[in-house]
């Protein structure tokens, strides 16, 4: 779909039917890449929806499109502010922060050094970052020392 408005409408119609992480993570209209400013409005709505895979999709879009040139530090806060007991939401939060460590280390690292995330997300983000090939060895060593037990 090449038209942004139509792609957004179709995405919004499809989101309530997603019931697994694979479907959630594999679809993304290419036209979204050309409309990053406009896409922030539905992303905020998705993050606040309370629906597990809609929330996950919002985080996925932030991870996909807003950790490079379009990055702003408040996007880290948007993801960190999502509170849920849903495993697949929390896993995406950790994945987002691990990816942010690779792409925006100066902004993301303080979230871990200052222990600003909940314990599970903190440790899972460290685990995913340490497993990543995109994180330099020195950063991995630092991250290992930041693991927390409580």
Predicted regions and their residues:
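Alpha-helical scaffold domains
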Residues: 1-150
